[in-house]
Amino acid sequence: LNGVYYYRRKSYKLEGGVSMGRHGTIAGRKAAQDSKRAALFTKYAKAITVAAKDGGDPEYNAGLRVAIEKAKAISMPNDNITRAIKKGTGELEGVSYEELSFEGYGAGGVAFIVDCLTDNTNRTTSFVKSSFDKHGGNVGTPGCVSYMFSRKGVLLIERTDEINEDDIMEAALEAGADDIVSDEESFTVYTDPSVYPDVHKALTDAGYTFIESDVEFVPSVDSTPSENDIPKLRKLIDVLEDNDDIQKVHTNCAIDLYE
């Protein structure tokens, strides 16, 4: 693959035709979501279809339940959600998708992990490689940056006057969360990936809503780029996130790249 490496995590046969590690401001995250809503519909539909391979009833499929709730949070139409489920359960004809991850560096040595879900690995590999090359980065070998991250469930909740810090802490910890970090804008709940769906459900049932929630690569080592590198990093993230094959982009950048 001309020096570009990726590792395959799982393949899916779909019947039918997604870092939050650095949140930035709540306003910045909301603005990013709004500007990419159409692309998010496509990405979330893929995620729902993949999750539905393990069963089309969200009551008994925690992964599907979470995927549906995330789609509803961005106002994805119910028809789109239903169609995506049917593609996963085999009620509609389908295509094959494969889940890939790429590791590499952006401008200034910022570490990137890019999660993909694609029906054409050559197309996606070429796109990711060229995107990094054009914006001052490079794709590396598996493991070249993943050692700087830990995989965790992350649930971001906006701080409001109606939310009591003790209540949310109690609800999260009782559901199995590992840690809760708060600041003037938000609460961030961290979980082991294995209990993420349970914590997500418990907090949803308790009436909390999420700005974002997912299983993330959370950086344990930060990278602070120069001012000259920040525009290149932001452009690279924009280019990657605008592509339907890219489900999630994780970085260890200490600077908010969504402002």
Where in this protein do the model-derived segments appear?
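Generic alpha-helical secondary structure signal
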Residues: 9-11, 48, 200
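N-terminal cationic and glycine-rich segments that engage phosphates or anionic surfaces
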Residues: 16-131, 136-140, 145-154, 224
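Generic detector of leucine side chains in alpha-helical contexts
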Residues: 1, 14, 40, 64, ...
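Residue-level detector of intrinsically disordered, flexible termini
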Residues: 2-3, 31, 50, 170
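Short, Lys/Arg-enriched N-terminal segments with co-localized hydrophobic residues
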Residues: 1-19
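Positively charged, low-complexity, intrinsically disordered RNA-binding extensions
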Residues: 154-259
